[in-house]
Every structure is written in structure tokens, then in C-alpha cells.
């Protein structure tokens, strides 16, 4: 199925690219999320008329993500208190939601989907460097310190 991308999609293309994808991927993911439209003659003309508006919107989103990344860099670290045993092993774990809530409480709005934990949840006290993917082009890092609750 031929489609026109309305946003940058990893491993597929950028704004305005006409690409061929499987019809299920287009119908079930790209179309419902507003990331693409079918590449009909009518849609191509409509897209070309709106291209400047869409490019401005994407540039605005990138600028907002860069501003948030600077705020995260100023924050540098965030501390989370969690119940733990004598040897530093947590009762439970610290996941993406806990980290996102702690960063948001510190003053920078972060969604849990933007927190990347490639090794899974954190289960011990200590310091961890966590990546935040604020935009497809903007990835920043923050130090998360997990301490035992008193």
C-alpha cells in the first residue's frame, strides 16, 4: 500500500515521503495515529497545500523537546525513596512510571513512555543513568538515585 508520511517514522522515512508499507501496518497503526494518509491523487494535492504548515508543526515539536532536554540537563539528577531491605534490595521495583513521576515532581514534564529502561525495572538502591527519549531526534540522560526509605 502506498502512503504519504505526515510525521517522521523510524526506519521508514520523514515528512512527505511516499513509501510502500504492508496494508495492515498502515490501517492499524499509521492511519489511526495520524502519521500517514493513503497516497491517492487527491491526498497528494492536499498534502502539498499543507506541507509548510506540517513542517512548522514538526519544527515546533522539536524545539519544545529541545527546551525540555535543556531543563532535564539543568536538573541533572533526581532522587527516589523506596522501601528496601538491609542489603539494598528493594521491596518491589522502580519502573518508568516512578521515574517519570519523580522528574515531573522536580519540575520537568515527562511521560512514562519517554523513559527508557533497556534492562528492565530497577530493583536495588544506587545511582543509575537513565535515557529519556523526548522526541525521535532528542535523547537526553538523567541520573536517578534510589535510596532506602527511612
Curated annotation (Swiss-Prot):
A Pfam family the protein falls into: Ribosomal_L9_C
Purpose: Binds to the 23S rRNA.
Keyword DNA damage on entry: no
Classification via PROSITE patterns: RIBOSOMAL_L9 (PS00651)
Lineage start: Bacteria, Pseudomonadati, Pseudomonadota, Gammaproteobacteria, Alteromonadales
UniProt protein name: Large ribosomal subunit protein bL9
SUPFAM superfamilies given in the database record: L9 N-domain-like, Ribosomal protein L9 C-domain
GO cellular component: ribonucleoprotein complex; ribosome
InterPro entries per UniProt: Ribosomal_bL9, Ribosomal_bL9/RNase_H1_N, Ribosomal_bL9_bac/chp, Ribosomal_bL9_C, Ribosomal_bL9_C_sf, Ribosomal_bL9_N, Ribosomal_bL9_N_sf
Keywords: Ribonucleoprotein, Ribosomal protein, RNA-binding, rRNA-binding
Family recorded in the similarity comment: Belongs to the bacterial ribosomal protein bL9 family.
A biological process term (GO) from this entry: translation
Organism: Alteromonas mediterranea (strain DSM 17117 / CIP 110805 / LMG 28347 / Deep ecotype)
MF GO annotations: rRNA binding; structural constituent of ribosome
Amino acid at each position: 500500500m502506498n502512503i504519504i508520511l505526515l510525521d517522521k517514522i523510524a526506519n521508514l522515512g520523514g515528512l512527505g515521503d511516499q513509501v510502500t508499507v504492508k496494508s495492515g501496518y498502515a490501517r492499524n497503526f499509521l492511519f489511526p495515529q495520524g502519521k500517514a494518509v493513503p497516497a491517492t491523487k487527491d491526498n497528494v494535492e492536499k498534502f502539498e497545500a499543507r506541507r509548510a504548515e506540517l513542517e512548522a508543526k514538526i519544527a515546533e515539536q522539536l524545539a519544545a523537546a529541545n527546551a525540555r532536554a535543556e531543563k532535564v540537563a539543568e536538573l541533572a539528577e533526581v532522587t527516589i525513596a523506596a522501601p528496601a531491605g538491609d542489603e539494598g534490595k528493594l521491596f518491589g521495583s522502580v519502573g518508568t512510571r516512578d521515574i517519570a513521576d519523580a522528574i515531573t515532581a522536580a519540575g520537568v514534564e515527562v511521560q512514562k513512555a519517554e523513559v527508557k529502561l533497556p534492562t528492565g525495572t530497577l530493583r536495588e538502591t544506587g545511582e543509575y543513568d537513565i535515557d529519556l527519549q523526548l522526541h525521535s531526534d532528542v535523547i537526553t540522560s538523567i541520573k536517578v538515585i534510589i535510596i532506602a526509605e527511612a
